């Protein structure tokens, strides 16, 4: 069964410096029908204005993944990390026993566009940690590139959950298939259009996938980018 989550049905929040679209309940947006999907708790699409960002704040017991689409994001945290996250980078922060961090757009004139992803961990009270890795467009072209996994295999970042995240870019007519067996999956379109087992999805759409043995995605345009979450 494939349940579509259209882009326009997402929650929306707007501040002077931040424009956000929520796939699941977050902040002031509450929808009991869309609290999470398996261990996937948050997919927020954020646009952060130049020279603005999230001031220092804390998290505990959450796996937080940031996927920058356009612009740059400056990260600082309480365990000594400081970095710039650019398109192609995947940032993973395990909050564990507690971590403070800030995320700031350092550009004076360019917004930053990103996906913020939260996954509920299968271990609580772990030592906070941070990881960041780059995946080129060629890594993702015409295939499912593993970018996050429980064991960090194939150069992916490591998360504390029985879940994997794949990134892909498909050209017109390019196809990728994935076997699910008895697992669930979520697909999130970043840009472009594709068909998922015959169903059409567009930019910003998501899809919850249950009780499907396999899925096939086919690009409908020059460069369709998406994330696939393999979930318990």
Swiss-Prot record:
Co-factor: note: Binds 1 divalent metal cation.
Species whose genome carries this gene: Synechocystis sp. (strain ATCC 27184 / PCC 6803 / Kazusa)
Position of the signal peptide: none
Assigned EC number: 1.13.11.24
EC class name: oxidoreductase
Protein name: Putative quercetin 2,3-dioxygenase sll1773
CDD domains in the cross-refs: cupin_Yhhw_C, cupin_Yhhw_N
Binding residues for a divalent metal cation: 57, 59, 101, 103
């Amino acid at each position: 069964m494939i349940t579509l989550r259209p882009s326009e049905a997402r929650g929306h929040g707007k501040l002077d410096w931040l424009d956000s679209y929520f796939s699941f309940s977050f902040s002031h947006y509450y929808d009991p029908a869309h609290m999470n999907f398996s261990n996937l708790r948050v997919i927020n699409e954020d646009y952060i204005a130049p020279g603005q960002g999230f001031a220092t704040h804390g998290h505990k017991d959450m796996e937080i993944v940031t996927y920058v689409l356009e612009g740059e994001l400056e990260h600082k945290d309480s365990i000594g990390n400081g970095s710039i996250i650019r398109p192609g980078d995947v940032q993973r922060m395990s909050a564990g026993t507690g971590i403070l961090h800030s995320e700031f757009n350092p550009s004076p004139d360019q917004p930053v566009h990103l996906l913020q992803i939260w996954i509920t961990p299968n271990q609580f009270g772990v030592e906070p940690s941070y990881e960041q890795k780059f995946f080129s467009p060629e890594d993702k072209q015409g295939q499912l590139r593993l970018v996050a996994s429980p064991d960090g295999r194939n150069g992916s970042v490591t998360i504390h959950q029985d879940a994997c995240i794949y990134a892909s870019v498909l050209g017109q007519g390019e196809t990728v298939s994935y076997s699910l067996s008895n697992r669930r999956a979520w697909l999130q379109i970043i840009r472009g259009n594709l068909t998922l087992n015959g169903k059409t999805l567009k930019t910003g759409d998501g899809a919850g996938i249950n009780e499907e043995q396999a899925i096939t995605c086919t690009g409908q345009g020059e460069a369709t980018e998406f994330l696939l979450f393999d979930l318990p």
